[in-house]
Curated annotation (Swiss-Prot):
Keyword Acetylation tagged: no
Full protein name: Deubiquitinase and deneddylase Dub1
UniProt keyword terms in alphabetical order: Hydrolase, Membrane, Protease, Secreted, Thiol protease, Transmembrane, Transmembrane helix, Ubl conjugation pathway, Virulence
Residue ranges that the Swiss-Prot or TrEMBL entry lists as coiled coil: none
GO biological process: protein deneddylation; protein deubiquitination; proteolysis
Main location: secreted
Species assigned in the record: Chlamydia trachomatis serovar D (strain ATCC VR-885 / DSM 19411 / UW-3/Cx)
Transmembrane portions of the chain: 40-60
Function noted in UniProt: Effector proteins function to alter host cell physiology and promote bacterial survival in host tissues. This protease possesses deubiquitinating and deneddylating activities.
Amino acid sequence: MLSPTNSTSKKAPVPPQDSSKPVLISEEPQNQLLQKVARTALAVLLVVVTLGLILLFYSFSDLQSFPWCCQTRPSTKEQPTISIPVPLPSPPLAVPRPSTPPPPVISRPSTPPAPTPAISPPSTPSAPKPSTPPPLPPKAPKPVKTQEDLLPFVPEQVFVEMYEDMARRWIIEALVPAWDSDIIFKCLCYFHTLYQGLIPLETFPPATIFNFKQKIISILEDKKAVLRGEPIKGSLPICCSEENYRRHLHGTTLLPVFMWYHPTPKTLSDTMQTMKQLAIKGSVGASHWLLVIVDIQARRLVYFDSLYNYVMSPEDMEKDLQSFAQQLDQVYPAYDSQKFSVKIAAKEVIQKGSGSSCGAWCCQFLHWYLRDPFTDALNDLPVDSVERHENLASFVQACEAAVQDLPELFWPEAKALF
C-alpha cells in the first residue's frame, strides 16, 4: 500500500557531521578581536612610555620637594633663588671720626695717625663737618697672668730647709730602729740586774690607757699580800714562777708600766684587736709607747710621753693622774701618811723628726730616772734633733748588746727574801 506522501516531496538524507573536525570561526569576529588586543597593547605602551618620560624628566629635579613624596629627608640640592633688584639707598653723610691710636711702644712714644676723611659721593651734598673731639688717651695694657704668676712665690731658702728636714728624718730613722714589746721587756730585765728595786713587768699584753690604773692597783694589792704572807690574788706572769714573782714583789720599790696607745680604738678590746692587726702586718702604724713610773719609795707618779701631748694635753693628764694618786693613797698608804705626787716629765716634743723611736725614748728616760730620780735629764738634751738621736742611738746599741744573751720572755731570778 502506497504512502500518502508524494515521492517528489522527499528530501535527500543529510550526511552526519564528523565531531572530530573543529568548527571554523568566521573572519569578521576574528578581526574585531585582533583590533581590541592591538588597541589595548598600544594603550599600555603609551602609558609606559609616558611614565618613563615623566621619570626621566623628574630625575633632574628634586622629587622630594613635592608634598606627596614619601621621603622625610630634606633635600640637599640648592633651590633656585629669584633675585629682585632693589634700588640702592643714597649713601649716608660721612662724619670723620678719630681713629684709635696703636698701643704705645716702650722705646719711643708713637704718634697717633691723623684721621682719614671719608669721601662722599659727588651727587650728594655734604653736611657741615663737626669739630673733631680730641683723641682719648690710650688705655694701659692689662697684665697677662701666667701659671707661674698664679702660684705663690716660695723663697729658695724654704726649699733648702725642706730638703734638710727630709735628710734629717732619713738619718734619724736609720739611727734608731723601732722597739717592740720583746726588746722593751729584755731592756727591763737588764735594768733589774743594775737596780734590784725595779720589777720587770711584762709588756705583752701591754697596759693601755684603758686598764693601766687597774694593773697598778692589782700589783700593789699583791705586794701588800706578799708582805703579809698571804697568797696573791692577781694573775701570775706567763714566764715567771710564783715563788720568783713573790720575791720580786717583796723587794720592788719601782713599777715601770709601759702603755701601748693607738688613737683609733676607743675601748680596751678594740685596742687589743688593733694591736694584733698591726702585729700581723708588721707595721707600727700610729701606735705609740708611753711610760708611767710608780715610785713607791718616793711616793711619785711620773708620766713620760716623748710626743708630749699625743694622748691628751699635759694639763688634762696631770688632772687625771692627780685623781689616780688619791686613789693610790687609799690602796697603798704610807707609814708616815705621805701622799703620792704627780710629775709630767716631758715639757716639749722629745722625738722630733722620728716616728718610731718612742719605745727607745721610754727606756732611755727610765734609765735616767734610775740613775738619779731627782735630776731632770731632759733639760740637758741637745737642741739639734740629729744630735739628740745620735745620743739615743748610742744608748740603743748598748742595750741591744747587753740583752743579746738574755732568754726570750724569761724573768730574772730575784734575790731571796731572807
